[in-house]
Structures are given as C-alpha cells and as structure tokens.
C-alpha cells in the first residue's frame, strides 16, 4: 500500500499534469474518468482537493470508491465529506459543480459494487486486503 506521502505526491503530480496541460491531459486514468473532488477539511475548515477515479457514473452523478488502495483506514477525503457532504466536483474541461455526497448502503451499494467489479475487478483486490467494507460514495449535483 502506498504511504500517505506517496499518495499525496501522486496527487500533486497528477494535479501538475492537469495544470501544465491546461486541463487537456489527466482527466482519464485506467479507462475511468477522473474527478477533482474538493471537500472542506473536518479539522482545518480549509478546502482540500483530491483527484479520484470514478468507475461508475449515473447521469450527472459520479460514484467514487474510498478504497485507499485496500488500506485499513478510510481516506481523509472520505472523512471530510462525511463531516460535510457538500462538495465541489470538476471533471474534464467542464466548470466545477456543487454536489452533495452520500454513502451508498444496502442493495444500492451491492448493485454498485457489482457494476464496479464487472468493469474494474482490481477493486476486489483492494477489498481482500482489508477487513473494512470499502465505502462507495455517490456525488450528486445539488438542484
């Protein structure tokens, strides 16, 4: 599993690629769209931005996976959006959109997990590395 330092470094390199290319490169990774998720830090109150892949999309909603590579702890961005579910999401060259995050549960989570596994089975390897149930988060536009 990648360390916090490695994950932050990868995120910074990815962000630099987006910036240097004028947003022309970096919006797809491993065949999935990339979303730029901005949460409010649960401790700091400051904006925190992460670049994440979305293996499933439903209309204007994105599904993101709080796998943290199969680590035993949830990613900081997940803890932040649990504390404050109002987030900002940017994907591609489209403007950023205010969205609300919610955690998929029960049958909805089961159906989404199946879709994710059918499309990107490597997520199953992450689940095998940890005892926690990897959360699936749905990002929906605020009407």
Task: List the model feature ranges, each with a label.
Residues 68-122, 129-133, 141-143:
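Short, structured beta-strand-loop surface elements
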Residues 1-28:
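Extreme N-terminal tail/first-helix region
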Residues 32-67:
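Short beta-strand segments
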Residues 28-30, 127-131:
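Short coil/turn segments at secondary-structure boundaries
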Residues 34, 134-136:
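Short hydrophobic/aromatic beta-strand or adjacent loop that forms the aromatic wall/cage
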Residues 57, 140-141:
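Active-site beta-strand termini and strand-to-loop segments that position acidic
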Residues 24-25, 123-127:
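Short helix-to-loop capping/linker segments positioned immediately adjacent to catalytic or ligand/cofactor-binding
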């Amino acid at each position: 599993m990648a360390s916090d330092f490695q994950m932050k470094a990868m995120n910074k390199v990815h962000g630099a690629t987006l910036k240097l290319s004028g947003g022309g490169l970096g919006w797809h990774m491993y065949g999935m769209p990339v979303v730029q998720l901005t949460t409010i830090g649960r401790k700091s109150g400051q904006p925190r931005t992460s670049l994440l892949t979305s293996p499933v999309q439903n209309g204007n909603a994105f599904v993101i996976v709080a796998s943290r590579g199969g680590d035993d702890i949830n990613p900081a961005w997940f803890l932040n959006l649990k504390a404050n579910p109002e987030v900002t999401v940017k994907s591609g060259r489209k403007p950023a959109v205010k969205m609300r995050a919610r955690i998929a549960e029960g049958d909805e989570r089961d159906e989404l997990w199946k879709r994710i596994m059918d499309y990107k089975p490597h997520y199953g390897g992450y689940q095998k590395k940890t005892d926690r149930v990897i959360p699936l988060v749905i990002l929906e536009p605020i009407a």
